[in-house]
């Protein structure tokens, strides 16, 4: 077809294990790429088909081939919360800190969805905890922005720098305050987040916060 989808890629993305078995037995090309450079492994990883991922890895499928937007099987497994697949890919040498076109890593994507198990797996395999994706967003900022308190706690336990600012000067604390995530604000304050920092628009977390309960937690900072 125009998209160059092989029978193996289609079977892998649809989760048809018995067809994958038959095709592999007939020496199907494991790493054949579709027109967007995705492979059977990529599709199985994205769609959460763990058994197929394991079969493809046993047939030496390439774990670090770059597909559309410079993403890899590890990216899409992390992004979609497939913990067992992330584990299997890392065990087969998936590169943990590859970046996609947006400067994102598997870690920043896992933090964005608040999957603490995957965050911890990636960190255990040496992921850079303070990596900044496009616009300066770190895993901690993304977790705080989306109210993923358990992920925030995990990142801090694993050495994330609390007060890093993105390109707009906004910290994890400011993002949590802006989006009404009181629990995340509490955790960040308990760990000593700097309340005096200002964004590029000259505002502190207290000034950014809309929720009165959050405003109360944050000391007003005089100039």
Name each model-derived stretch.
Residues 2-3, 35-36, 68-69, 101-102, ...:
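Ankyrin repeat start-site detector
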Residues 16-24, 49-57, 82-90, 115-123, ...:
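Ankyrin repeat structural motif
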């Amino acid at each position: 077809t125009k998209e160059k989808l092989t029978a193996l890629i289609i079977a892998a993305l649809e989760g048809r294990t018995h067809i994958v078995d038959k095709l592999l037995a007939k020496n199907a090309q494991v790493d054949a790429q579709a027109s967007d450079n995705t492979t059977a492994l990529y599709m199985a990883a994205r769609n959460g088909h763990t058994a197929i991922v394991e079969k493809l890895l046993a047939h030496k499928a390439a774990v670090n081939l770059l597909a559309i937007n410079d993403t890899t099987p590890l990216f899409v497994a992390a992004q979609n919360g497939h913990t067992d697949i992330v584990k299997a890919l890392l065990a087969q040498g998936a590169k943990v800190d590859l970046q996609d076109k947006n400067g994102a890593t598997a870690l920043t994507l896992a933090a964005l969805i608040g999957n603490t198990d995957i965050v911890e797996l990636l960190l255990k395999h040496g992921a850079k905890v303070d990596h900044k994706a496009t616009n300066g967003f770190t895993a901690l900022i993304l977790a705080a922005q989306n109210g993923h308190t358990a992920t925030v706690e995990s990142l801090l336990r694993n050495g994330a720098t609390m007060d890093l600012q993105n390109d707009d000067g906004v910290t994890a604390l400011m993002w949590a305050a802006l989006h009404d995530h009181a629990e995340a604000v509490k955790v960040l304050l308990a760990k000593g987040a700097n309340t005096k920092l200002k964004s590029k628009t000259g505002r502190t977390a207290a000034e950014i916060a809309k929720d009165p309960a959050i405003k109360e937690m944050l000391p007003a900072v005089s100039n």
